[in-house]
């Protein structure tokens, strides 16, 4: 059976661990415990093919920047996460996560995932963001960023509501089993 290594990255507290625990156990964790490194494994059947999906949960906090990249070798697909309710985590995809992943693994496919989709219409979240002069990230903003970083797909999910979680990892498997050429936006012109 083919094994696929999927590394999940993104800012601290965007919901990476909840996404992985929800996918592997169908349960939502009750408390937030910052991750240093964790591994999960699941058999996944996608388009009639069964694979062993090795899921790597990484620390988003800056103090783990040097340690985190040790998990990158032999990665088959990256899932870069941001919270729909956190515009700074969205901006960090462009400024931190995409550059880091591309530096270490330039030819590995990327999925961009907006987490905590359930908070987009939640009154307390909307009020908090409005007080900061911000708003939740829209699906259109997610699609635009995915295009900008040449992600294979943009998906949204809510681990709390078990909405879109299975689709994230099905698409991660598809990105490996059915690769599309990765366009990085760089071209070489010889004169």
Curated annotation (Swiss-Prot):
Keyword match Phosphoprotein: yes
Entry GO MF terms: GTP binding; GTPase activity; protein kinase binding
Keywords: ADP-ribosylation, Cell membrane, Disease variant, Glycoprotein, GTP-binding, Lipoprotein, Membrane, Methylation, Nucleotide-binding, Phosphoprotein, Prenylation
Cysteine methyl ester modifications at: 188
Cellular component per GO, a single term: endoplasmic reticulum membrane
Subcellular localization: Cell membrane
A Pfam family: Ras
Binding locations of GTP: 10-17, 28-35, 57-61, 115-118
Glycosylation sites: 35
Oligomeric form and interacting partners: Interacts with ARHGEF26. Interacts with ARHGEF16. Interacts with UNC13D; the interaction increases RhoG affinity to the membrane lipids, targets UNC13D to membrane lipids and facilitates cytotoxic granule (CG) docking to the plasma membrane.
UniProt record similarity statement: Belongs to the small GTPase superfamily. Rho family.
Record-linked PANTHER family: RHO FAMILY GTPASE (PTHR24072)
Name of the featured protein: Rho-related GTP-binding protein RhoG
Protein's organism: Homo sapiens (Human)
Gene name for this UniProt entry: RHOG
